[in-house]
Amino acid sequence: MSGHSKWNNIQGRKNAQDSKRSKVFQKLAREIFVAAKKGPDPSLNPSLRLVMDKAKAVNMPNDNIKRAIDKASGNTSGENYDEVTYEGYAPGGIAVLVHALTDNKNRTSTNVRVAFNKNGGSLGETGSVSYMFDRKGYLVILREGLTVDEEEFMLEAIEAGADDVEVSEDVFEIFTDPATFSEVKEALQEAGYTFATAELSMFPTVYNEIAENNQTQFDKMLEALEDDDDVQEVYTNAEIN
């Protein structure tokens, strides 16, 4: 992963996502609803605890979080969402994974296909690009105000169960096996650390630089996908400088 900081990619798109905060909250509410159907108590439901932490990290109001949990707990309408993943390529051969939660697969697949086709991309079959990504736990700790040195922190994180640690001037990035993510997170929390990001995510095994003549179409395609109410996450192997 060295040299391909996910944190840099996150920061590179942060302003655009902040401008759509209400849509972010709407999508998180759906994710909370789905997780809470497995149980409303986050201490007994790791999936709910994880998405609640994700919601709090973007300052989603507690009332919104509680409302989504209550809706799932008292759901008698039969409302339900299926998890669906779409795979394909953006212009220039950039691999794209689209994760959706939908109550209408036909609607979502049509919208996703249009987003690809209208912007020079192509939707592929299951397995066409997913082999280029690994699922990992991902934690980010801001270094501002910390006194711990790099070697000391790296040792601490590895002893907590981390698979890898990347160090930059501003942040520590910690990568874990998905199965040990919660364990590592809790160990570092108990050591006094707080997280700017804590999530399970997909990471490219190889990054692909976007050619300048493909950048506009690529940006439009990502915007179209992220604007879709059913799309929860979009992962690519684009390298953002």
Curated annotation (Swiss-Prot):
<dbReference type="GO" id="GO:0003677">
    <property type="term" value="F:DNA binding"/>
</dbReference>
<dbReference type="InterPro" id="IPR029072">
    <property type="entry name" value="YebC-like"/>
</dbReference>
<dbReference type="Pfam" id="PF20772">
    <property type="entry name" value="TACO1_YebC_N"/>
</dbReference>
<keyword id="KW-0805">Transcription regulation</keyword>
<dbReference type="GO" id="GO:0006355">
    <property type="term" value="P:regulation of DNA-templated transcription"/>
</dbReference>
<comment type="similarity">
    <text>Belongs to the TACO1 family.</text>
</comment>
<dbReference type="InterPro" id="IPR002876">
    <property type="entry name" value="Transcrip_reg_TACO1-like"/>
</dbReference>
<protein>
    <recommendedName>
        <fullName>Probable transcriptional regulatory protein lmo1535</fullName>
    </recommendedName>
</protein>
<keyword id="KW-0804">Transcription</keyword>
<keyword id="KW-0963">Cytoplasm</keyword>
<dbReference type="InterPro" id="IPR017856">
    <property type="entry name" value="Integrase-like_N"/>
</dbReference>
<dbReference type="InterPro" id="IPR048300">
    <property type="entry name" value="TACO1_YebC-like_2nd/3rd_dom"/>
</dbReference>
<dbReference type="InterPro" id="IPR049083">
    <property type="entry name" value="TACO1_YebC_N"/>
</dbReference>
<dbReference type="InterPro" id="IPR026564">
    <property type="entry name" value="Transcrip_reg_TACO1-like_dom3"/>
</dbReference>
<keyword id="KW-0238">DNA-binding</keyword>
<feature type="compositionally biased region" description="Polar residues">
    <location>
        <begin position="1"/>
        <end position="14"/>
    </location>
</feature>
<dbReference type="GO" id="GO:0005829">
    <property type="term" value="C:cytosol"/>
</dbReference>
<feature type="region of interest" description="Disordered">
    <location>
        <begin position="1"/>
        <end position="22"/>
    </location>
</feature>
<dbReference type="Pfam" id="PF01709">
    <property type="entry name" value="Transcrip_reg"/>
</dbReference>
